[in-house]
Regions:
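Catalytic donor/gating beta->alpha subdomain of glycosyltransferases that bind UDP-sugars
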Residues: 1-59
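Intrinsically disordered, low-complexity N-terminal regions enriched in serine/proline/glycine
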Residues: 43-46, 62, 92, 110
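Membrane-embedded multi-pass helical conduit in multi-pass membrane proteins
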Residues: 68-139
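Short, flexible loop/turn segments with low-complexity composition
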Residues: 62, 140-141
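Hydrophobic transmembrane-helix microenvironments that flank and shape a buried ionizable site
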Residues: 1-3, 63, 119
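Select subsegments of transmembrane alpha-helices in polytopic membrane proteins
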Residues: 59-67
Length: 141
C-alpha cells in the first residue's frame, strides 16, 4: 500500500539515503493474468495518490504521467469521433507502445503480451490515481 514510497520519503526527509544495490537478489512473481495485473496497478495508483496527499514533496511528473496519459488518450478517442485529426495523440501513444514492445520483447509471444501489458499498467495506475478517494487512508490510522 505504497509503504516503500512513504518509507523512502521519510528516510530522505530525515537525512537518510535511498539507493539500489545491484548485488541484491530478489524474487519477483508476476501476475498470472492481465486482469490481475490491472488490479495490482489500480491499487498502486490509488495508494500513490494517498502518499502524494500526505507528503506533497513525493509527487513529480513521472507519477502524473499515467493519469495524464489515461485522460489524454480517452479525450483523444472521444474528440477524434468528431474531428478525426484528434485521434493523433491516441495513435502516437499506441505507436510508442508498439515500439517499446518491439524493443523489449525477446519473442513474438512476449511482444504480443507487452502490447496488452504496457497500456494495462499505464491506464490502471492512472485510473487508480484519479479515482483514489480522499477518505482512503492506511489501516493504522
Amino acid at each position: 500500500r505504497a509503504q516503500d514510497w512513504e518509507l523512502n520519503f521519510r528516510l530522505r526527509e530525515n537525512g537518510g539515503l535511498v539507493y539500489f544495490d545491484p548485488r541484491l537478489h530478489v524474487t519477483y512473481r508476476p501476475r498470472s493474468t492481465v486482469r490481475a495485473l490491472a488490479k495490482q496497478y489500480f491499487e498502486y495508483g490509488r495508494w500513490r495518490r494517498v502518499v502524494s496527499r500526505r507528503h506533497s514533496g513525493t509527487i513529480n511528473y513521472r507519477y502524473l504521467a499515467p493519469p495524464f496519459a489515461l485522460v489524454g488518450f480517452s479525450l483523444s478517442l472521444i474528440a477524434g469521433i468528431f474531428l478525426p485529426i484528434l485521434f493523433t495523440p491516441a495513435a502516437i501513444y499506441l505507436l510508442f507502445v508498439v515500439l517499446a514492445s518491439i524493443k523489449i520483447a525477446t519473442s513474438i509471444r512476449e511482444y504480443l503480451l507487452l502490447l496488452a501489458v504496457i497500456p494495462t499498467m499505464h491506464f490502471a495506475w492512472g485510473a487508480g490515481f484519479i479515482s483514489s478517494p480522499k477518505t482512503l487512508v492506511p489501516a493504522a490510522e
